[in-house]
Structures are given as C-alpha cells and as structure tokens.
Amino acid sequence: MNTPDDSSVSSVDSHQPYMGFDDNVEKRIRELARSLTQQSLTSSNRSVNKEAPADGSAPLDRVSTRASSIFSADFKGVNPVFSDEEEDDYDARLDPNSDEFSSKAWVQNMAKITTGDPEFYKPYSIGCCWKDLSASGESADVSYQSTFLNLPVKLLNAVWRKARPARESDTFRILKPMDGLLKPGELLVVLGRPGSGCTTLLKSISSTTHGFQISKDSVISYNGLTPNEIKKHYRGEVVYNAEADIHLPHLTVYQTLVTVARLKTPQNRVKGVTREDFANHVTDVAMATYGLSHTRDTKVGNDLVRGVSGGERKRVSIAEVWICGSKFQCWDNATRGLDSATALEFVRALKTQAHIAKNVATVAIYQCSQDAYNLFNKVSVLYEGYQIYFGDAQHAKVYFQKMGYFCPKRQTIPDFLTSITSPAERRINKEYLDKGIKVPQTPLDMVEYWHNSEEYKQLREEIDETLAHQSEDDKEEIKEAHIAKQSKRARPSSPYVVSYMMQVKYILIRNFWRIKNSASVTLFQVFGNSAMAFILGSMFYKIQKGSSADTFYFRGAAMFFAILFNAFSSLLEIFSLYEARPITEKHRTYSLYHPSADAFASVISEIPPKIVTAILFNIIFYFLVNFRRDAGRFFFYFLINVIAVFAMSHLFRCVGSLTKTLQEAMVPASMLLLALSMYTGFAIPRTKMLGWSKWIWYINPLAYLFESLMVNEFHDRRFPCNTYIPRGGAYNDVTGTERVCASVGARPGNDYVLGDDFLKESYDYENKHKWRGFGVGMAYVIFFFFVYLILCEFNEGAKQKGEMLVFPHSVVKRMKKEGKIRDKTKMHTDKNDIENNSESITSNATNEKNMLQDTYDENADSESITSGSRGGSPQVGLSKSEAIFHWQNLCYDVPIKTEVRRILNNVDGWVKPGTLTALMGASGAGKTTLLDCLAERTTMGVITGDVMVNGRPRDTSFSRSIGYCQQQDLHLKTATVRESLRFSAYLRQPSSVSIEEKNEYVEAVIKILEMETYADAVVGVPGEGLNVEQRKRLTIGVELAAKPKLLVFLDEPTSGLDSQTAWATCQLMKKLANHGQAILCTIHQPSAMLMQEFDRLLFLQKGGQTVYFGDLGKGCKTMIKYFEDHGAHKCPPDANPAEWMLEVVGAAPGSHANQDYHEVWRNSEQFKQVKQELEQMEKELSQKELDNDEDANKEFATSLWYQFQLVCVRLFQQYWRTPDYLWSKYILTIFNQLFIGFTFFKADHTLQGLQNQMLSIFMYTVIFNPLLQQYLPTFVQQRDLYEARERPSRTFSWKAFILAQIVVEVPWNIVAGTLAYCIYYYSVGFYANASQAHQLHERGALFWLFSIAFYVYVGSLGLFVISFNEVAETAAHIGSLMFTMALSFCGVMATPDAMPRFWIFMYRVSPLTYLIDALLSTGVANVDIRCSNTELVTFTPPQGLTCGQYMTPYLNVAGTGYLTDPSATDECHFCQFSYTNDFLATVSSKYYRRWRNYGIFICFIVFDYVAGIFLYWLARVPKTNGKIAKNGKTAKVNFIRRLIPF
C-alpha cells in the first residue's frame, strides 16, 4: 500500500520560525543520506530533500524535530498491524490510532518490509509515455435545444446519421497531437483553462476512453503494455479519479473505505496478518492520514442525505484511491472543495508516494499555488486542445519568457502558465514589441513554436529512447507482481485482486450495511405489504367462508391478486439500480469488482427482505382468504409465489440495466407489467385470446405459475352448488337433469361442480401441468438472473459528449443568418481580434490584475489600486447598500441523535457597505452554516444571538433584500441565461419598477459579467450547456439581477474555477464593493494575491469558534501581525498568508496549534474592540429613521398573482423543453392503450365479451403506477430548485409554486387522456355499443371526460404523495399502495355485496369505484346480450313441456335471460342474461349514476390537490417561531421542518 506524506510529523514548534530549508539544513541532510547504505530506505529521503521548494516554503520544524528522526531511522520492517504499546518494538508513528502517527513513517516501514523480501512482495513500478496522442469525440447531433416538437426530427436525423456513410463532420477533435513522458516517481501537473482538454488528457493516459476515441496513430505505452492490455489485465494499476465525489450515501466513512480495502487486500500482504486484519489496519491508516478518523461512523451522505462535509467527502474519494494502491494515478481537479493548506498537503502526499513507492501521478489543478507547483517534476500546458509545452516544471517559466511573454513579479508560475492561454490575460514583453519580434499568440502559432523548440526535440528523443528500451522483462515484472497480489482463486489474467466469489462476499457485506443504515425504506415495504395482505385478505373473507361453486370467480380473482402482488412487488427496485450505477461504474475503473459481482450480491442481499415480505404477505393472505387448509397445498402456493417474486425481480432488473435513465425504463417496464398481468390467463383465458396475441401467454412466466396455483387450489375438489337454473318457487322440488348448476363446469343432474371440470372448461388447465409451472418459473428465474449479470457486466454507461453550448432553435436560426452576413462583411478581420472577442475572461479584471502585479510594493497605497479598479469598471447603475449588517453572540445548535451539538459558538462580526469580507476556516468549521444562519436559511436547529440590520432585527423583507450565491450552481437547466436573469429581476425587484427598466438592468448585469456571447445559451447540464465558469457567473448574475439593497453572500464563488476565472470573480466582487455593495464571501483556496483583495477577515476554527475578525491590511500585514504577536511563528515573506494562517491555528491536515487561538482571541484587545464597536453600532444605528416604504417591508417584492403568472409561464416552458418526460408519458399512453385495445379488440356482446370489456377498463387504470413514477422525479427536480434557491431568497411564494405545478401539469394530462380515449374507446368497440343504444355522441363525450379525469387524477394523487415526502421512491411506494387499495375495493374483483360489511366504507371512498362504475356503464349499457355456445347452460325440460313453457315462470321472476329455442323439448339452451344492464347490476353498476359518478370523481381530484397543498405547507414550508432572549431582544428566527415520518 502507498500512503501520502503526513505533512506534520511533529506539531508546530512555536519557537521555530517558519523559514523552510536553509542551506545548513540541506547540507546536513545530504551528509546524512550519504552516510547510509544503499539498502537503507533513507535513499528515498534524498528525493524528499529535492521536494523542498526553492523558496523555502517547507516548514523547518518538520525537518529539525521529529522529521529528522524519520529521515535517519533505519526501519527494521516492523509489522504495523499488531502494534502493541506493551511490546518492545512498538512505534507510535506506525499506529493509526495514536496521536503521534506519521504516514510517512508508515510508508517507509512498509517499503522496508517489501524491499526486504522482493521474491515475496514483488516490488514494481509503472511509467507511461505517449506519442502523437490525439482524441476525438462524436459531434453532438443536438446543436440546438430539444423541445416537444423538434425531438422527433432530431431523432430521425440521428438515425439517418447512423445509417449513412461516416463523415469527417461526425467527429470533432478534442485533443490535437501531443507527447509526454512520465518515469516512475514523477509528478505531472496539467494546466489549462476549462475546456482546454485537461480532463480528456487524463482520461486518455489512464485508458478511460469510454465516450471518445483515441486516434489510430497515437502511441501510449506503460512499460511496454498497451492501453488494451491495461484495460483487460491491469485496470487497477492505472486509475482515473473524477472530479465528482460519488459514494453510497448511507454507508459510513469506515464502511465505504473498508470495503475498498477488503477488495484490494493482496495475497502477498505482511506475513502473519489475516486478510481482515490487514484491511482494517489499512482503513485506519487511510482515515488517519487524511483526517477522517473523527468521521469513522458518520454517513458519507450526499446532497439529500446528511453526512460528512463536502471537503471531507472529497477526502473520502482521495482515500479510496490511496487504498487501491494504484501505481499510475490521474487526478481530475482533486483539490476542489479543499482549503489551500489541505490541497497543498494532498500534493505533498502524492510526492511522498512518488519518492518512496515510485508511483506516478498526473494532476489537473485549476487553482495551483506556488508551493504545490514546486512539488511537481513536470508540467503540461494545454491551450484549446493543443499542447504548447511539456517538460520540466521549473523550466516552463523560462520557456514562455523566451517565447516573448512577461511574468509580473508577484504572479505565481502556474498562474503565469495558465495566463498564456488567455489573450486577455497574457502580457507580451515590451522588448519583443519594440524589436518587432513576432510572438506566437494563437494556439497553432504556439504549437508550431513548441514543435520547433529544443525542448520538444529532447522530449521526442527521450520518448523514442524509452520506447526502444522497453522489453518483455518489464511486462513480465508487472505481470508477476500482479499475480502475486491476487487471491488463490483469482484468474491470473483478471485485473481484479480477489476472486469473483470473494468480491460477491464483500459487496454482500456492504449491501447489508446499506440496508441496515437505511432500514426505514425496507421496513416500510415489509410492513406496507403486510398491511396490504390484511386488507386484501379480509376483502375476500366473506366470499370464502363457504366453498360453493358460486365463489369460483372470486376465488380465481383472489389467486390472481396474490400472484400479481407478489410478482410486481419488485417493480420499484428499478429506482435503487440507478442510485448505485455510478458507484459501480467508478469501482469498475478501480478494478475493485466485476459489475456482475455487484449485481450478484445485490440479488442475494435482497433475498432476506423479499422472503420476509413474502412470508408475511402470503401467510396472512392465504388464511384470511381461506384457501385450502392443507400443509402441502400451502407450501406449494408459497413456493410458486416466491418464484414469481424472483422471476419478476430479475426481469425488472434486466430492464433497468438496459436503459440509461429511470424515465426510459418506465416505458418498457410498464408495458411488461401490462402484458404479464393481462396474459396471465385470468383476465382473458387462453382459449379466448385473439390469435395474434396468444404467443404472449406462452412466453409469460406468470401464466404458468398462475396455472399451477389454480390447479393447486381446485384439483380433486367438489364444490357444492347453491345456485341452479331454474330455481325458486315451483322449481325447488326439481331434481335430476331438469335443472343445472349455474356455474361453468357444471353437469346436468349433479348438485356439485368438480374443480377439475371448472378449470378445464374455463381456462383449459389440467392437473398434470402443476409442476410444469414450477419448472418453467425456475427456468425463468435462472435465465433472467444470468441475463441480468451479463447485462451488468457488459452494458457500459452513457457516453460523454464534448463540452458545447446549446441554444434554442430560434436563436440558432438567427445566429446562422447573422453569421452569413458577418462572414461577408468581416472576411478580412484579424483572427487575433476574433479570438480576443471569443474569450469570456473579464478584460477589466485582467487589466486590474496586471496593474496590481506591476505596482505592488511595500509603499504602494491600496487605495490607489482600488480607485484604478473602480475607474476601469463600467457604470451600470448597480444597487448601493447603505445599511450595516452586524451580529453578536451568534450560536447555532442542532440535535444529532440523542445529543445537541453546537455548530457555531458566539460568533461576532459585521459587514459594512463598500467592504469585501472574507470568511475562512477549515472544512467543517461552520462557514456555510454561518452564512445560512445570517441569511435565515437554516431549516432545523436553534439559533441564539443578535442579528441586526442598522441596529434593528431583520424584517420580513430581509431575505429578498440580500443576494446569496450558493456553492452549488443551481439553475433551471431548460432556461436560457437571459431568461434566468430576467426571472430573478421580474420577481425580486419591486413591482414599482417597470419591465423595461428591469430588462435594461439585466442587460447591464450581462455586460458587467461579460456574458454577452452566451446570453441566449441554454443553462443545460455540464457537457451540454454552460461550463463551470459560466455557471458561476450566472449564479452571481441571478443575485445581482435581484438588485439586493443590503448585502451579498457568496459561498465558495471560486471553487472549481481556474486561477484566471477565480481572479476575475474576485475582481467582480471588488467591483461590487466599490459600488457600495456589502459582501461577505467564504473562500477555500485563496492565493496570496486573491487574499489581499479582501478588506476584512472572519476566521473560524472547528466548532464554529472565532479565531480572528478584523482588517487584513495591506498585504495581509495586519492579520499576520496579530498572529505573530500572539505566539505564531514568523510568516515567510513569500508564503501564502492563507496557508500560513491555516497551519498556525492547526486547521491544515496534520498541523497542530501551539495554543487555543479561540481563547487567545477571546482574551485579546482586538476582541474587546469588536465588542465595543458592536455595542456602539447598536446604539447609534438604531436611532436612524426606518424606511416607511410599503414595498420595503413586504416578504415578496411582487403580488401572488404576478408570481403565479410568471412561474406558470416558466414551468410550461420547462415542460415544453423537456421532451423526454412528455414523450415518455405519451408513448407510454399510446402503447398501453394500443396493447389493451387490440387485446380486447372489438369485444362482442357475449358474457365473455362483457367480462372482457369490464376487465379492459380494469387494465386501463393499471397505467397509473408508471405514470406516477414518471411524474414524481419531475416534481422533485422542481421542488429541489425552489427550496434550495428560490424560496430562501423570497423569489416567489410557496403558494405560487404549488399552484403552478398543478395548473401546468393538467393540460398535458388532458392531452394524454385524449390520446388514450381515441385509441382505447374505439379499438375495444365501446362506440358500437353506444351506436346500438342510439347514444353515440353523449356516451362518447362522457367517456372522453372520464378518460381525461383519470389522467388528471394520476397527477393529483402524485402531488398528494410527494408533497410531504423527501424521496420520490418512498412517495412511489405510498402511491402504489394507495392505488392498489383503491383498485382492490372498486367492485370489480369483489362486488360490494360480497365484501365484509367492515370494508364497505372502502368501496365508497375508493375513487376508482366511481370511475370504473361510470366507464363500464357508459361503455356497455343498454345493449342486448347474445351468449356464445360455451356460455349456454343446458338442461332437460319435464316430459310433455317445451323449454318455453317450462321456463316462463322463472323468466317472469328473474326478469333476465333467454332461451335459444323456446319450442325445444329435448334440451333447453339458456343464457343467464339478455340485457347488458342486468349484467351491470351484478357488479353494482348503474347507467343512471354516470354523471353523479363524474362529479364525485372530480371531487376526489380536488381533494387530492387541496390535501397535497396542505401537506406541503405542513411538512415543508418553514414555520417561524420568534424566541425572546433574556435581555428582551429577538434572539433568533428558528425554522422548523415538520417531517411526516415516512
């Protein structure tokens, strides 16, 4: 295992100045290294000396104190796993649970162990060289935004592109030919602007090329191994770590890391150590190394699940890769979200790995400090996909200076190198201009210069030499090392360390942890299904009290319910598949496990909850329904249903693994659900199926299982007959063949019906097929299981697309038209000017930066710099703040489990107009929490203290009077930049301001943020929309467009940006401050230059405790002086003050403060001055007159009606621009209704035809679940954006939000209902019934109204279940159970007369009761019935009587039925019904109630909407509780979210 450097091997010595390595120290270390033998591990420490930056930024005490002992220690290779303090060889530096633990010592000790027995441990290394490397991606076929109308055209174009011969325009070049060489032990930093190809380069050299292609001419070699060999055999040795932190949120940090450790534990580990002990030890070392030990039992979390902080989550990602022990690592912006000191320690860690373990690391860093840069051996500079330099990191500056560029004195080397790629940023040396020397400026010019340079020739020679000297021995060394690490049963050619079954074992443990940590979902499913068993079983309870032939239909219906409920209980598993897929993809690239092993383990881990659910449901249901009381029959019933559960589970998993998104999966899943349920054999017996569709029955596993269940229940049973034809009155004494049982399968003269006869005549089922169902079911279980494993193993994720802006189609047309005109008028335009115009970096900010770099010196006046900045900015009428915002004794407590934790501890401060205040601290110190508390954005916990505006408590308009730029760039992805800004301006600026003025202000914001080139671009998603920088600008722009009059909060505005964009962003903030705006900004990685742009600093340490609040001073001298006066070691002149300060207070990883600087602050004179200033503010400012303007004190700037209008317009626009949701809804509707319609095509007027029409209506409603599952994620996306950004800023009211959701969804559902009506109504043949009854128009119109109402009802119930739920999956569970209950009690499966009296109320409150009653009566009423031959009952009339004479009394009483031949004397053929209304009466359906039912159903829809609105208010709208402190002032505004416990 490799480990990073523990940057603080010893605590900071306050008596030693922070001066770095001086000449004497370097001399002593060199002498010490020479004195040791070659075998000593201190040979690697000579390279550590080279690691020391030339500017002396490494702390001296790390060398002169305990570090010196590490450098000189001759480790004996102590087994670190069983370190015991009682043992003589115990070394605290090797114990991860000790405060004295040193990761560097641990690595050196492990290196000593491995080098001591090379035959066992097989040490090896991997380098890489690439030659003429170029990459290309598929040109996106979506150059314009997709909408509901243009999506089909785009899809047809895409099909045409696939069908026609390939063209050069089908691909675009991401990387142009480039070269590089990395030897073992080297570090490479890749510098370039966003979009320059940094990520693609890292993916290319790490052989992670899914989504783009490497050209055939490219050469990539890893010690002689090709990329294909790496992918196939050594995937885990070459790793790419993406920027995003993707983890299973419900796992703890320990569980996440120990799983990786188990899967990467080598066979040739430390001798005498078990696999489990080694994995646990390595996990402890990783957590200690990266400062995660305190989060051991904390969930990793994500945006929805509370867990560790963002910085800690990033460290978990880093620890994962470290545990993997990869020899070649590629890190994509791995320092994002880390403070500057932690980022530096991360690079130092990589340096230690490189020197001691001979690892290779390539890092793309957007904001690279000089200290971090000094640790790299090589640098690659990319410019729009071209490589313009590769070579020695320290020589790069000289190279570009020779090219003709000037590096200002204060500019760091990485900033200088990145600035070369920005025409607005770079500066040409005046001497070159004066001499007329041409300086390369375009990418092509720079590439040409690079290819003609001596550095390039030398690089090519080294690459050629390396390729020439690569041999089979190098490959064999890697192969032997890889095999030595593999477990016993692992294939030697496999890239994985442990065997397949061990992978399954460890993932299984992980999955059980997941289930345990999120047990609420599983428990809800188990107990929810058990409750449904009680409900459904009791519904059939009265029916099954007897075992007469009258119960045949209901007994079959109960069995049908049983198998469907068991089979489709796994449908929602599709949700969880998409949650875990990104993690599986990541772990596949780390070679942790086969994706199929993860699938295998997921199936096994779901067995216990499935079995428990099946046991509870089936026991309850079986005995309540009163199925056969026979042990053998019960266990067979249970076995068949369990097979149904797993067969369908595996089938739905196959569907999920084939599709890329949940909405894509819902269409085939719903079609399968419909087909499987309709062709089970109950709704339509196989003998009655249409010829074209009968094949579906033969491939339907549920059909065979249902047959087995029915045979199991009916075989070898006699069912007494209670109902005869004829019966009653004089017929009571009739016996023999003169009457017949009114049941299918009855025989004249018998007073019973054999179950086998019933099955044969009704379904063509036979007892000999009983075990056939079991065999077929098991075959399907096994088949779908292996298909699922194969799909998971070989189905890759979605391909990436190159970064591109997307515009609406109308804008693209306009741009093309303008482009043709521009091409004609600007044919001779200088290309450099065009390039300058295309850049999005703020030129004003660049000029200010250059001026600052040139003019800064000890005597420079910071005010002159500021005035220069002010003079360079355009006057756009930005709002100016006049109020002072201040807070005192601010505390924030949150309940965590059984205790209350204090997050903020008596924080004081203020923000004045025209000042730029920085808020800093280590990860988890409470910076974002402080901003949330100040901005009234907390949703839980208790806030105490005073938060004032001009000495008075915040009023109701406070939230909309501030701007809050969140760290996450949250925007509506379908809107354009200009639309986003206007939406903010329209709703957050006062209504008294005209639309024209608001539009002008928006244009001014676009201009000051330099967003003109993409003002009409769609926000989109990363890769297809705005890039990181553009999103950050839009985030700031949205808040500026609101024209905040008090202050602006910015949370990590520079996170993820390159140094130039970070500088431009900082200058923008400075510009706003110069316009009188008050700004409070959190910042993680400020460079020395960025730091000095701030006026004041509020610094927090762990626990939310203040360490410093005050002026920074010129060059941060005021802040530095404060810490130095209070015991801190001296800050070197060239050090970054931010990094120095983090180390002083112990906020940097591994550093330790020499005292509690919070207590130092509380006892300082500066603290007293702050308190005095706050008291003075409170007294003086409170005397100012209040703003009596009515608009100033409103919670929202505009009226509710105006908000509602704008939100509706935006939401309708979003639906129109989200064609995948709408087309999924409509395609699902069309295919479902076509399937139902043609399955029951033109149903006739026989009894079976009537039953088919009734069951078709029943199936018509089954589309509910898929429609619901499509809608819920769409609503959640809207809600997340509103609750995260728009509600806290008081953009618009929750009432406008929820009402708009209702109003905009309804029209699309009306369209869906109309489509369903047109297809279903006419294909089933209801129109023929209406025509025969001479009611064609009325009944057709009414059926259409009901069809629309049903689709609207789906949306209303969806809103109801998601209104109080956080997660769509839970809401889908609740919605599915509610729908199942409504469908069960609607009167189709069990008539109200047959239900227990207790459940009659459910029949009456089920909305589907009224829907199906009305649809059925409207569809089939007032039509004559004509029975088929098989439906006629046959009996013999008494001697001497005709059939008519014999049946006349019966017909007069019954009022329904007819004889086919009343004059017959030998056999009477009788049909039980003569009129459809008589059939409707048996299911309690009445035609005259149709309009009443419509009104009641509409009331259900209204109720769902009203209840949904109420529950949303109750569960998710913050309630304000003003608490009064002892001094009588308002202490807090506490937000409480009352969550419904689901």
Curated annotation (Swiss-Prot):
UniProtKB keywords: ATP-binding, Cell membrane, Membrane, Nucleotide-binding, Phosphoprotein, Repeat, Transmembrane, Transmembrane helix, Transport
CC annotations in GO: plasma membrane
Keyword Oxidoreductase tagged: no
Molecular function GO terms recorded: ABC-type xenobiotic transporter activity; ATP binding; ATP hydrolysis activity
Post-translational modifications: Phosphorylated by PKA. Dephosphorylated on glucose depletion and independently rephosphorylated during glucose exposure or under stress.
Cytoplasmic topological domain: 1-517, 793-1220, 1516-1542
Domain of life: Eukaryota
Keyword Phosphoprotein (UniProt): yes
Record PROSITE patterns: ABC_TRANSPORTER_1, ABC_TRANSPORTER_2
Record: residues binding ATP: G921, A922, S923, G924, A925, G926, K927, T928
Region Disordered, annotated ranges: 1-61, 825-846
KO phenotype (gene knockout): Increases the susceptibility to rhodamine 6G, cycloheximide and chloramphenicol, and also increases rhodamine 6G accumulation. Suppresses the development of high-frequency azole resistance (HFAR) in a medium containing fluconazole. Impairs the blockage of the efflux of fluconazole by milbemycin A4 oxime when CDR1 is also deleted.
Biased composition (Polar residues): 35-47, 835-846
Main localization, broad class: membrane
Compartment(s) where it occurs, according to its Swiss-Prot or TrEMBL record: Cell membrane
Membrane-spanning intervals of the chain: 518-540, 552-574, 603-625, 634-652, 662-684, 773-792, 1221-1241, 1256-1276, 1296-1316, 1342-1362, 1370-1390, 1495-1515
Induction profile: Azole exposure induced expression via regulation by the transcription factor PDR1 that stimulates gene expression via binding to elements called pleiotropic drug response elements (PDREs). Expression is up-regulated in azole-resistant isolates and in presence of fluconazole. Loss of mitochondrial functions leads to increased expression. Expression is temporary increased during the intermediate phase of biofilm development. Expression is down-regulated by the transcription factor STB5.
SUPFAM superfamilies: P-loop containing nucleoside triphosphate hydrolases
Gene Ontology BP annotations: response to xenobiotic stimulus; xenobiotic detoxification by transmembrane export across the plasma membrane
Family matches, as CDD domains: ABCG_PDR_domain1 (cd03233), ABCG_PDR_domain2 (cd03232)
Database matches in InterPro entries: AAA+_ATPase (IPR003593), ABC2_TM (IPR013525), ABC_trans_N (IPR029481), ABC_transporter-like_ATP-bd (IPR003439), ABC_transporter-like_CS (IPR017871), ABCG_dom (IPR043926), ABCG_PDR_1 (IPR034001), ABCG_PDR_2 (IPR034003)
Extent of Basic and acidic residues compositional bias: 24-33, 825-834
Membrane topology qualifier: Multi-pass membrane protein
Homology family: Belongs to the ABC transporter superfamily. ABCG family. PDR (TC 3.A.1.205) subfamily.
Alphabetical list of PANTHER family matching this protein: ATP-BINDING CASSETTE TRANSPORTER
Name used for this protein in its record: Pleiotropic ABC efflux transporter of multiple drugs PDH1
